A protein has these predicted regions:
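Solvent-exposed adhesion/ligand-recognition segments of exported proteins
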Residues: 70-74
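Short acidic/polar N-terminal linker immediately downstream of export determinants
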Residues: 4-12, 16-67, 78-99, 114-119, ...
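Extended, compositionally simple hydrophobic/Ser/Thr-rich segments
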Residues: 38-50, 96-98, 103-233
């Protein structure tokens, strides 16, 4: 019931005061010129696919009558994917194909879905953030991985790292058991759920009605409050 109320409020917020457009059904593609970027931020109802390549490239696929309202702009090294202000869409097809040599930051909000078709690699760190009803799915390989999921969003990861720092709140879900981490620090609150792995050490904190489930032989330090649980899978 709470999630239904949440999505109803979100829909009213998005559509209130907006000019509404219905997708024509005639799907076209358009290559966009772009400055170099290593991060991606997408909101709304976009589907974003990330592919590895030698240079940055952005291709938008959508209904022909919606193309003028799809915005792609690089700000401080982050590709911002959005729609025009005060424009709402119904029955819309909105996909963005992104190619980049390296991506080390992803921010998905609203009802956006961001999927990496190739493993994301960095010599330093990778940070992933999700909110609203957004979803991020990726395989990652970096010394440090940071995730933060809120609202009713989901982050699903595989790969490997030496240090994994994770936060989940609201009714968010972190599906990261397949991320082979040496040292993991996870904090879960609200009604969120976090699934993690550690081979060396695990520091877990859960509050409210949150759940933390873990795999691996890492030495465990845990703290719970309320109706929260921290258990092995």
């Amino acid at each position: 019931m709470k999630q239904v109320f949440f999505f109803a409020i979100m829909l009213l917020t998005i559509t209130s005061g907006c000019q509404q457009f219905t997708g024509s059904g005639n799907i076209i593609t358009q290559d966009r010129k772009t400055d170099p970027f290593k991060g991606i931020a997408a909101g709304g109802a976009f589907e974003v696919e990330i592919n590895s390549g030698s240079s940055n490239k952005v291709t938008v696929e959508c209904d022909d009558n919606l193309m003028p309202y799809i915005k792609t702009k690089v700000v401080n090294g982050v590709l911002k994917i959005s729609t025009s202000e005060r424009a709402g869409f119904a029955n819309a097809h909105m996909k963005v194909f992104v190619t980049a040599p390296e991506i080390d930051f992803i921010d998905a909000s609203g009802a956006a879905t961001i999927k990496a078709n190739n493993q994301l690699k960095s010599d330093d760190k990778i940070k992933l953030e999700s909110s609203g009803a957004a979803t991020i799915k990726a395989s990652v390989d970096a010394p440090q991985i940071f995730t933060e999921a809120s609202g009713a969003s989901t982050i699903e990861l595989s790969g490997r790292t030496r240090q994994y720092t994770a936060k989940a709140s609201g009714s968010a879900d972190l599906k990261t058991t397949d991320l082979q981490s040496e040292n993991t620090e996870v904090t879960a609150s609200g009604a969120s759920s976090a699934h993690v792995h550690s081979s060396v050490s695990l520091v877990a904190t859960a509050s409210g009605a949150a759940n933390v489930n873990y795999r691996g032989a890492g030495a465990l330090q845990k703290k719970t409050s309320g109706a929260a649980n921290i258990n092995p899978e």
